[in-house]
């Protein structure tokens, strides 16, 4: 069976979602997107450059968060699928979304605030231990919200083009969230600079302990704005209700109706080659998007030696470019298909990597490079999510497990990659020595060009063996 094709015995196709319903769904991940923007772009920079923790210590905290997220994601996905029909008031997906939202709101501000009770004599390991529980709670909440929100896509719409449109709208608000974070960061840094008396000095143009209030205020703004949009999601999105499973009684038929659709369980997915093909492509995509977002601030600060305002303006340009690209996804997919759309996005990212390799001093051309990176990342991310929805097709009862498994590989791979990069950092006794200038230059090349080649190989496998279920026999017993 090809995912997305109608199955025998299936009910009538649901009506198309209204614009209000589509927008309500799209803002449901806004809090997660705001927090993820700060997490990936500023966590290492905050811990290493502002709090002066070692590169390995900062990488260890990010690894802890990614592993916690990765472990929680498939568990939440499995439980969300298992809870179908049990949450009579709001539905299992929305219930998990609410739990995750509360965890994020309560934990995230502590991550970007100074350690309570810590002083100048506090050893680094004790401070890192303090941040650990907040990071674990935050990542559990983030995973619960993400999986609940993603698994609603095949629940709400069935058409391929509607899935692309909903995914593109979701990503458009992801871009808006990133623009909001970087715009707020630029404003806070500018206000801090104008409040400083005396002529501007070189030290004031670079990050340091004086920037702690900027990140603390930014984290509080993030959770405040995100809470409002989460409320709008819960008020405007209706999850399709499923009747709870009933115990058989004397009036129940002994044989199930012949028209009932067999269920594709989580263990069946593990036998499908397409599950691993799409999973590898999704993991490669997330590595490119997340690692480039994580290290772009380091690259700007240490390799290009730009003032600290660029850690807000360059990511802002990237996500404006991504925002514009997201609206082209639906017509481009219709014209050239999923695979070619993804390939075009990869070509743009590889062009960025080649530019970084060939040019050491970008100057004002760094804005053009940011446009390329932002547009390419938006294209491959939206397309990979649409491919995942294609894989799930009508089997929405186990969709959360699929998204959970995909996210598990992505989160753990991201965490391990960051830890490896941080362990290779050449400056052990200071924040940045001469060697780290070239170090972050080649990190940006590796996380875009190197991982881009791996993504190309994954895409080639989908061209040879397209997405479809090959091993599952609907007539076999689970």
Curated annotation (Swiss-Prot):
Biological processes per GO annotation: alternative mRNA splicing, via spliceosome; carbohydrate transport; cysteine transmembrane transport; melanin biosynthetic process; negative regulation of melanin biosynthetic process; pigment metabolic process involved in pigmentation
Pfam families from the UniProt entry: MFS_2
Subcellular location, principal: membrane
Subcellular location: Melanosome membrane; Lysosome membrane
Keywords: Acetylation, Amino-acid transport, Lysosome, Melanin biosynthesis, Membrane, Transmembrane, Transmembrane helix, Transport
PTM-bearing positions, type N-acetylmethionine: 1
Lumenal side: 48-56, 119-124, 190-216, 301-308, 360-361, 422-436
Topology with respect to the bilayer: Multi-pass membrane protein
Highest taxon in the source lineage: Eukaryota
Record field: catalytic activity: L-cysteine(in) = L-cysteine(out)
Annotated TM spans: 27-47, 57-77, 98-118, 125-145, 169-189, 217-237, 278-300, 309-329, 339-359, 362-382, 401-421, 437-457
Similarity comment text for this entry: Belongs to the major facilitator superfamily.
Described purpose of this protein according to its UniProt entry: Transporter that mediates the import of cysteine into melanosomes, thereby regulating skin/hair pigmentation. In melanosomes, cysteine import is required both for normal levels of cystine, the oxidized dimer of cysteine, and provide cysteine for the production of the cysteinyldopas used in pheomelanin synthesis, thereby regulating skin/hair pigmentation. Also catalyzes import of cysteine into lysosomes in non-pigmented cells, regulating lysosomal cystine and cysteine storage, which is essnetial for redox homeostasis.
The name this protein goes by in its record: Major facilitator superfamily domain-containing protein 12
Source organism of this protein record: Equus caballus
Gene that this sequence comes from: MFSD12
